[in-house]
């Protein structure tokens, strides 16, 4: 087995080698889309942890039973008989 020594070749790159690493428009769009998805995922994870830590703060003060009672009393004018 022969081993080769890789020195600091990044300092010796020519202009053609540097342009070979440039991204196309499709790659830039893909990376931007993945970045936006990662940010969205991070926000969802933070929101889920907030709900897990304090689940009752996000609930409204009225309950479904209160709304059903009002519906049975006929307080909604748009209800069809």
UniProtKB/Swiss-Prot annotation:
Taxonomically, the superkingdom here is Eukaryota
Kindly state which keywords UniProt assigns to this record, in alphabetical order. Answer: Membrane, Transmembrane, Transmembrane helix
User: Would the keyword Transmembrane helix turn up in this protein's UniProt record?
Assistant: yes
**Membrane topology (UniProt):** Single-pass membrane protein
InterPro entries for the chain: Cortexin
Q: Where in the cell is it found?
A: Membrane
Q: A single Pfam family, by name?
A: Cortexin
Query: One GO CC annotation, please?
Result: membrane
Where are the membrane-spanning stretches?
29-49
Family according to the record? Belongs to the cortexin family.
What is the protein name given in its UniProt record? Cortexin-2
